[in-house]
Amino acid sequence: MNLKRTMFASGLVILIAASLAACGTSNDSENMSENGNAKQTIKVGSKDFTESLVISEIYADALEENGYIVDRVQNIASSVIPQSIEAGEVDLYPEYTGTSLLTIFDLPLETDPDKVYDLVKKEYEKNGVLTVLDYAQANDSAGIAIKTSVAEKYNIYTISDLQKNADKIRFASQGEFDQREDGLPGLKEVYGSFAFKSSTVYDNSLKYQVLLNDEADATPAYTTEGQLSNKDEFTILDDDKKFWPPYNLMPVIRQDILESNPEIKTIINNINKDLDTDTLIELNAKVDIDGEDYADVAKEYYESIK
């Protein structure tokens, strides 16, 4: 082989290798932590409904903005995701304080938000694997929605008001709500009997349309549903006797991830401090009512608060 060609080829290989190394150093520097170590890939999980998808995407956007690589692990069933994070399949995901209290840990009912948070935080940290970050004021709890016109007509703004005026109200119920202890039977124990003018069972997906069609006046609801953004049509009643526990949005994270990436606490807590119930209603409405893509909604919201 020609010696000059051999030397040229060898030099070219060295030059290419050096260039690739330089490029790698440049890219890696964007994903370096403050102590000089490369930032980890963070697996951000979500449950299989709009609100969880939007919030987890906001978390992911914030982490990427701060130099992390994010692996999105989406649409996990609510019953499965606690095991997923324990197993390391997920590093971080948005959970709810009430779900943690009653479903995950099967603890006694508590309605004070701070007490609920303290109780579940202690449970998450027991095995040294998980912990939680600050909870948001946003509360995705059970509730009762009423037509705003009816609320104004009869001065009904709390569940106590509803109980006193039940004989004027056509109730659009759902099958399980009539039997479950966290539904009508439990409400009766706390508020007294609800002698509705009428009560008809409808499919959950039809409840707001039933109210709009003037077939009923009130219905079981969740307090962050997108339809509630239409305040001219719908009003959520205040649970004035605190029958339902709070379901404040709360990030669950693996302790090992937080220990090796402590800045994640500040990144995610900065998001949660601005999240209130009305904000969640608006975010859900953009996806479920307006038909926007959840990732676009999350990106737009994150850009507005960062």
Which residue ranges define each predicted feature?
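C-terminal motif of bacterial Sec signal peptides marking the signal peptidase cleavage site
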Residues: 18-22
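Short, polar/charged alpha-helical segment
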Residues: 50-69, 85, 90, 185-189
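Ligand-binding "clamshell"
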Residues: 104-114, 118-133, 227-241
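Ligand-binding pocket segment of bilobal, Venus flytrap-like solute-binding proteins
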Residues: 169-239
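Short helix-initiation/N-cap motifs at beta->coil->alpha
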Residues: 50, 72-83, 100, 175, ...
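Short, low-complexity, disordered segments immediately C-terminal to signal peptides
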Residues: 8, 23-41
